[in-house]
Amino acid sequence: MSKFRVGAIVPVKTFLRAKTRLNLSEEKTEQICSIMLESVLSAISQSNVIERTVIVSKDESAFNMGKKFGAIQIYEQEELGVNNAVMLGDSYFVKEDFDLTIVFPQDIPLIQPEDVRMLFEMKGSNRCVLVVPSRKFDGTNALLRMPADVMETHYDEDSYKIHLNTAEKKNATSALILIPRIMLDVDDQADLRLILTRDLPVSKSLESVFKS
């Protein structure tokens, strides 16, 4: 485990309200969201970098999944978006005196433990922000912030550019980090079909649901 106290924040939208662009049945959507979340939590847990993981959600299925990995549960009364969810996670980790946090979405199923370690090891100064963008460079797929409260997040607003610009305004060093497996998130069926081409167990699990 790192000498730094590293926390992971995983905002989870209610499975049945998530991924509507997949155009799948509610049952299949819920199964796919569950498989993806399990893959993300597994990678975090096995990375030997993250001391504690927080799931912010109002979905009981997500919390039940989190229990398998010892995740802390923060219940959202209302789903007010990713930024609000991250803010709740921030409050927890600042109160617990963690040195840095990494925000991971629920929909990057290809992520591996070594990807988490790589991102952590790329941090520079003790005041830094690292952004892993989405494959389409239209969002932020992982966000490392040190210290944990160095800045608020700006998801859903051309976020990766804004995160880098905000870091500069906060006098934090920043960098865009390209980690292919983290960059591939699932928003629609084209993304999902791309995931299915990968020779990984999670791809097989997703395929069994998608093609059933």
Identify what each model region corresponds to.
Residues 34-49:
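A short, N-terminal amphipathic alpha-helix
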Residues 48-72:
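Acidic donor-binding segment of Leloir-type glycosyltransferases
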Residues 67-100:
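Short phosphate-binding loop-to-helix
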Residues 105-109:
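The conserved acidic donor/metal-binding loop of glycosyltransferases
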Residues 111-137:
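Conserved donor-nucleotide/metal-binding helix-loop-beta segment in metal-dependent transferases, i.e.
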